[in-house]
Amino acid sequence: TVDDVIWTFNTLTTKGTPFYRFYYGNVAKVFQTGERTVRFNFKPGENRELPLILGQLTILPKHYWEIRDFTKTTLEPPLGSGPYKITKFEPGRTITLTRVKEWWGKDLPVNRGLYNFDTIRYDYYRDGTIALEAFKAGEYDYRAENASKAWATAYDIPNVRNGLIRKQEITHNRSSGMQAFVFNTRRE
């Protein structure tokens, strides 16, 4: 709802981590303009990414969070509106998501072919090297590699050569940042 959007923005910029205050700091004002519309007024300046940044705002349900202390850490799975819900977890180790059978968006054309698994389990590894070795040993099924050195050298293993592991570049066609070292060479 419009109330959820405004409440989320105001809560993140007042009670959220400093990251959110900085991230949304170029918004001067947010207000309702219609039954289902919200307007964000920007501060003067040259932040061309701000519309994209606001489009990434995760909307929180006001009715759920306003009766809880938003600033406190909790292990209670939050209320969501997506295709999966948290059904089991061990903090710092694993989390299991179960598909919501009556999810409101399941029949939308944009979701065709998505969210096909009944359960998804994420295992967490504190060390990237151990995670890579666990993947090679078949402990988990999917790995996104973002280190160019590992992409070039770490997957020269029998399971890649015989096709049990498929190493594939996947174009996602989304706007994203870059991975680089950028040096400030200005003298002033």
Q: Where in the sequence are the language-model features?
A:
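Stable alpha-helical elements in mature extracytoplasmic
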Residues: 1-9, 49, 80, 100, ...
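Aromatic- and charge-enriched surface segment that lines or borders ligand/interaction sites
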Residues: 1-18, 33, 39-41, 125, ...
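Sec-exported extracytoplasmic/periplasmic mature domains
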Residues: 10-17, 45-47, 65, 102, ...
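Extracellular/periplasmic solute-recognition and catalytic clefts
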Residues: 12, 29-31, 87-98, 123-187
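Short, solvent-exposed secondary-structure boundary motifs
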Residues: 15-24, 72-79, 159-164
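Surface-exposed binding/hinge segments that line
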Residues: 20-64, 83-90, 186
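Envelope-exposed proteins and targeting segments
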Residues: 26, 34-38, 80-82, 93, ...
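Gly/Pro-rich hinge or "lid" segments in bacterial periplasmic/extracellular proteins
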Residues: 54-121, 126-130
